[in-house]
UniProtKB/Swiss-Prot annotation:
Organism: Mannheimia succiniciproducens (strain KCTC 0769BP / MBEL55E)
Gene name as annotated: ccmA
Name of the protein in its database record: Cytochrome c biogenesis ATP-binding export protein CcmA
Keywords per UniProt: ATP-binding, Cell inner membrane, Cell membrane, Cytochrome c-type biogenesis, Membrane, Nucleotide-binding, Translocase, Transport
PANTHER family recorded: ABC TRANSPORTER I FAMILY MEMBER 1 (PTHR43499:SF1)
Function text: Part of the ABC transporter complex CcmAB involved in the biogenesis of c-type cytochromes; once thought to export heme, this seems not to be the case, but its exact role is uncertain. Responsible for energy coupling to the transport system.
InterPro entries, sorted: AAA+_ATPase, ABC_transporter-like_ATP-bd, ABC_transporter-like_CS, ABC_transptr_haem_export_CcmA, P-loop_NTPase
Length: 215
């Protein structure tokens, strides 16, 4: 990882349909930051993460990665980014092994088959690696998606509800992984409906930036 990376959010506003969700949202993140985006349902947490990941456009404002607008450095930005959304984002026609191999070869990842075997064991898919993803349960498909976390060397992780359908021990394991990512100089941004058991976490509440009619 680069010694210092910075994600700068400058006066973002977000609109969904006819509704403005938030306005004038600004903050800076740098290597070592571990942040939870908090707020009630419908306030715009997922919309914000999609904007930060370059998958949606803000109503106004800029997102910069290492001082450059992400729209102008897409190739570099996507190489440096691991984004996990609500959906597993895997290829249903590929096996668990093939999905991880595809991701490993295409992304900013640790290389080698031994890495994949270790990760499959870690997420409980060893023995199911040759099953086509479409034949696996929704929970098992999510494990394929989460397995990318142990493979990725991307410095920026943006994760939408990574703890959904994960038991208490799994939450603890994932939280430890997120802390390690930050300690290594990465940046982790996530949303969660449950408490994140980490003293290293910084919380940003979107309610502070909620649009009101008298603004």
């Amino acid at each position: 990882m680069q010694s210092v990376n910075q994600l700068k959010i400058d006066r973002l506003a977000c609109q969904r349909g006819d509704k403005i969700l938030f306005t004038d949202l600004s903050f800076n993140l740098q290597s070592g930051d571990f942040v939870q985006i908090e707020g009630h349902n419908g306030i715009g947490k997922t919309s914000l993460l999609r904007i930060l990941a370059g998958l949606a456009q803000p109503l106004s404002g800029k997102v910069r990665w290492n001082s450059e607008e992400i729209s102008k450095c897409r190739e570099e930005y996507y190489y440096d980014l691991l984004y996990l959304g609500h959906h597993a984002g895997i290829k249903p026609e590929l096996t668990a092994w093939e999905n991880l191999k595809f991701y490993q070869q295409a992304g900013h990842c640790r290389q080698g088959d031994e890495i994949l075997w270790n990760v499959l064991e870690k997420v409980g898919l060893l023995g199911r690696e040759d099953i086509v993803a479409s034949q696996l349960s929704a929970g098992q498909q999510k494990r394929i998606a989460l397995a990318r976390l142990w493979i990725s060397q991307a410095p920026l992780w943006i994760l939408d509800e990574p703890f959904n359908a994960i038991d208490k021990n799994g939450v603890k394991v994932l939280t430890g992984l997120f802390e390690q990512q930050a300690e290594k100089g990465g940046i982790v941004i996530l949303t969660s409906h449950q408490e994140v058991p980490s003293s290293a976490l910084t919380v940003l509440n979107l309610a502070q930036y909620k649009f009101t009619d008298n603004e």
